[in-house]
Amino acid sequence: MAGINQTKCDLGFQITFNTVYRFSQFYTFSVSSFAVPGLIYFMFKRLFQLYFHGNLKTLLIAYFISILLYAVMLCFAFGYQFFVPFFIKSNCDLIINKTLFKYIHTSVIFLLTTPMMFPLGFSIERFTAMAMASRYENIRTLIGPVLVIFLIIPNCIIFYFLFQHETYDDTFISFLMLPNTTAVNFNTYLWFLLYLNIGNLALNVLLLLVHRKFKRRLLLHKTSLSTRYAIEEISQSSKFTLIITFTHLLFFGCNTICSILVRVLGEPFFGSFINHSVARGVNCAVPTYNLVIVVVGFVSLSKLNSRRQQEVQTTVQLKTTGKEGARNYDNITANQWATITQIGF
């Protein structure tokens, strides 16, 4: 038994000090370390100050908080894996404690999958906003918080059934390596999330196309200024969620496909157990997304803001001539007198 353990320790040493593996650990730790302050800055500088409706804003805040928590957990997990080898006294010190692995591993992969649930919430909220465009801005913030709860609960239930009988008896040197008894079912769940988000992305594109036709139809009719403005707000916020959804799907899809390919191709393709284990331990796509999304968020919001101002000045404008101009003048005058009367009383 001791010989088997020592063999595993020696294998762990060879994997840990493999050049590709060491670089990937350092890369993921570094990217995550930059992503954490970047996400915090983005949330306080842009996200909390968004002009979007409270329902969508709640979903976006919950989404970015889950990404932030994932980045924090990656900092700990990959920081541990990168720095611990500098202080080991024997090869067996590289083997992660069973209890520590259990809690860190499940937390990391739970936070990997949780953000993938929120794009579905974006679509539901956006369709609701379009269907109730004329009065949506006056509706209280309710559907957003409800969706956050109902999107997280299924992930919790799935994880409970995935890991309820897991004993974690394997030997692990990485928090990202799945136990063999759970790997197949978890990979199936990843495929499900990937297909779900591909379908959701198509739904978002359809939403924008329908919204564009809906917007043109409204502009042809004599709609109120507030309705036109609300339609424009829905258009801009929907474009932002589409950008977020597409970017996340791109990186998550790359991560999922590569991870499953490594398992499917197996040890023969990589030439040895060491090389195969190194490939399983590399995790760069989603951690990179955690940093990239900060840049994407700032740039896309800046561009959408400028387009929004242009649209407001061109399509959502107050006419001052003709019969419509006279009605607008009467409405403004009446509102001013009503305000003065309320102040007087």
From Swiss-Prot:
Glycans are attached at N5, N97, N180, N275. Expressed in the head sensory neurons ASI, ASK and AWB. Not expressed in male somatic gonads or sperm. Residues 1-22, 80-103, 164-189, 263-280 are extracellular. It comes from the Eukaryota. It is a multi-pass membrane protein. It is found in: Cell membrane; Perikaryon; Cell projection, Dendrite. Pfam families: 7TM_GPCR_Srb. Disruption phenotype: Reduced brood size, which is in part due to an abnormal distribution of male-derived sperm in the hermaphrodite uterus following mating, with sperm reversing course frequently and accumulating at the spermathecal-uterine valve 1 hour following mating. No visible defects in oogenesis. Double knockout with the mcu-1 ju1154 mutant suppresses the sperm navigation defect in the srb-13 single mutant. GO terms for biological process: sensory perception of chemical stimulus. One of its GO terms (molecular function) is G protein-coupled receptor activity. Residues 44-58, 125-142, 211-241, 302-345 are cytoplasmic. Keywords: Cell membrane, Cell projection, G-protein coupled receptor, Glycoprotein, Membrane, Receptor, Transducer, Transmembrane, Transmembrane helix. Its main location: membrane. The chain crosses the membrane at residues 23-43, 59-79, 104-124, 143-163, 190-210, 242-262, 281-301. InterPro entries: 7TM_GPCR_serpentine_rcpt_Srb. GO terms for cellular component: dendrite; perikaryon; plasma membrane. G-protein coupled receptor that antagonizes the negative effects of the gcy-35 oxygen sensor on spermatogenesis. This leads to the maintenance of mitochondrial function in developing spermatocytes and/or spermatids prior to testis maturation during the early larval stages. Regulates the navigational capacity of sperm during hyperoxic conditions ensuring the proper targeting of sperm derived from males to the fertilization site in the uterus of hermaphrodites. May act in the same signaling pathway as the neuropeptide flp-21. Belongs to the nematode receptor-like protein srb family. PANTHER family: SERPENTINE RECEPTOR CLASS BETA-1-RELATED-RELATED (PTHR31216), SERPENTINE RECEPTOR CLASS BETA-13 (PTHR31216:SF5). This is Serpentine receptor class beta-13. It comes from Caenorhabditis elegans. The gene is srb-13.
